[in-house]
A protein has these predicted regions:
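Generic structural signal for hydrophobic
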Residues: 106-107, 136-137, 162, 206, ...
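Core AdoMet radical
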Residues: 73-128, 141-158, 162-200, 216, ...
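Alpha-helix termination/capping residues and helix-transition junctions
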Residues: 63, 108-109, 164, 209, ...
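Alpha-helix-loop-beta-strand connector modules within alpha/beta enzyme cores
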Residues: 129-145, 194-213, 264-283
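Conserved strand-turn element in the central/C-terminal portion of the radical SAM core barrel
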Residues: 148, 152, 188-189, 202-228, ...
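N-terminal pre-triad scaffold of radical SAM enzymes
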Residues: 31-76, 105, 114-117
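Catalytic cores of alpha/beta
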Residues: 155-164, 223-239
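Auxiliary Fe-S-binding modules of radical SAM enzymes
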Residues: 7-50, 209, 231-365
Length: 365
């Protein structure tokens, strides 16, 4: 008998992992699987995620070796690709047609405001991402698509094709904010194929092909950079017309950097606040004041303006591609992707007054 096709696979370290590959199959975040009703569960203080985060998937896995990543090649002996945790959670695998049907049938109860295709370093990743994109736009045109790209395998023509096929936003996971940190965590130093120059090519192509407000860069705070370095990078992206999607460094179990400390809370809160000011409040990194250690000591705004921004809580929510409701708030709320619910770094929901007080205390050190 031919084997029954698998519609859904939940990571199981004690069973042989089935061979599942894109474009027939995709991995999705645990939050997305809960929102779609594919796995039981509830998320602390948030009912759902507003972005369906999908990963292309292959049994051979990602061929890159980024030091902080749970999907990295160096984990091959320890865990099958489909079983690897990534940004703190499991990524179940589902049949793509089943995912589309569930969303079309309203399994997300209208919660998804965006879908994101995350590419990995694999020879088939580009072509398969085109297939996933085209299928989605044909079936669910009312839910816009973002591409989290893999510049290492791409050329400018690929961006033009993605725009033609209906992608709305194109993002680049630069992650490291200096060439030195990039090289140490993603480049030759760790036997990984990524190159700083190629990533910048992709950001410049995105600015040209997708245009202002339609591209962005992922940046990770806490990998050895100063606050001045990461905020000057935010300003550079903003001046090109892009947005900055900020992630807190959290040591991923099984990664080469699993023993690194998580980002300092005060540093993270100041960077979150300054990034919001740069992206949405008309402030500039070159108008901010930094001390000798590169820490922000003045955000370049009046006290009352700064207090109103902090009180809104918005700077401390997860940053990413926007939803329909508020361009300053990310649809991609990645619940607990960089911290546990007991010590939230990126809030996947609107903050209440108690949350804001906690954040203020953290900022004050």
């Amino acid at each position: 008998h031919p084997e029954q096709p698998i519609n859904f696979y939940r990571p199981d370290y004690h069973a042989k992992t089935p061979a599942m590959r894109s474009p027939e199959y995709v991995q999705m975040s645990t939050a997305a699987a809960i929102t779609l009703g594919l796995i039981p569960g509830r998320m602390y203080r948030t009912a759902c995620t507003h972005c369906l985060n999908l990963l292309v998937t292959y049994p051979e896995g990602c061929r890159a070796n980024c030091a902080y990543c749970g999907l990295a090649r160096h984990r091959e002996e320890a865990r099958d690709y489909a079983d690897r945790n990534f940004i703190r959670v499991d990524w179940p695998t589902a049949h793509y047609d089943e995912v589309i049907e569930r969303v079309r049938a309203g399994a997300d109860k209208g919660q998804f405001q965006r879908m994101c295709i995350s590419m990995i370093t694999h020879p088939n990743s580009d072509a398969d991402s085109f297939v996933l994109l085209e299928k989605w736009v044909a079936a669910l045109p009312h839910i816009p698509v973002s591409i989290l790209s893999n510049p290492t395998t791409m050329e400018k023509a690929d961006l033009i094709e993605m725009k033609r096929l209906g992608a709305e936003i194109f993002t680049v996971a630069l992650d490291a904010v200096t060439p030195e940190i990039f090289e140490r965590t993603r480049g030759k130093t760790v036997d990984s194929p990524h190159r700083w120059e190629k990533y910048w090519d992709a950001i410049e192509w995105a600015a040209e092909v997708f245009g202002p407000e339609r591209f962005g860069a992922h940046l990770i705070c806490g990998m050895g950079e100063t606050e001045a370095e990461i905020l000057n990078m935010c300003q550079r992206i903003k001046d090109m017309g892009g947005h900055n999607h900020m992630f807190a460094f959290f040591p991923e179990q099984g990664s080469l950097m699993e023993d690194w400390p998580a980002v300092d809370r005060g540093q993270w809160r100041r960077v979150q606040l300054a990034r919001f000011i740069i992206d949405y409040a008309g402030g500039r990194a070159d108008k901010m004041v930094f001390n000798a250690d590169g820490q922000v000591v003045d955000f370049g705004l009046t006290a009352s303006t700064l207090e109103a921004i902090i009180h809104s809580g918005k700077p401390f929510q997860t940053s990413g591609c926007p939803g329909k409701d508020d361009t300053e708030i990310s649809a991609c709320n990645r619940p607990y992707g960089d911290s546990p619910p007991s010590d939230i770094l990126s809030f996947p929901f609107a903050l209440n007054e108690k949350d804001v007080e906690i954040v203020k205390r953290q900022m004050a050190g």
